[in-house]
Swiss-Prot record:
Cysteine pairings via disulfide bonds: 69-109, 85-102
Location of the protein in the cell: Secreted, Extracellular space, Extracellular matrix
Major place of residence: secreted
Gene encoding the protein: WNT-8
Keywords: Developmental protein, Disulfide bond, Extracellular matrix, Glycoprotein, Lipoprotein, Secreted, Wnt signaling pathway
Protein name: Protein Wnt-8
Amino acid sequence: SGSCSIQTCWDQLGAFDIIGEALRKRYETAVLVDYINGNLFPSEVKSKDASEPVDKSDLAFLELSPNYCQLNSTIGAVGTLGRECLRGRGVDEVSEWEARSCKRLCTSCGLGVKRTKVVVSSSCNCKF
């Protein structure tokens, strides 16, 4: 008689919210770098010595992100001036994402919010 055992191993991703939070923290401490002779060096001296290469565990970027608040046709950014905030049709239909859309589009770019109410009348061709 013999015995048999099977082992199965697999990798599993962590919980999405935990991974997202870890990425957000790394994003907030990301290092602007220059690529010199195959190495990445901090562009601005913060807590690191500019002569010391960036650590492999650091999140690094080579250039600043464009300002998406401003019109920039070169990169296809339409800016936020004059854009409509996303809203649901009824009070119960507004998600948290929709409720925060004005803040994302306007106030985070230094713009104010102008509220307008539009009433649309249409014929439904009803027959009684």
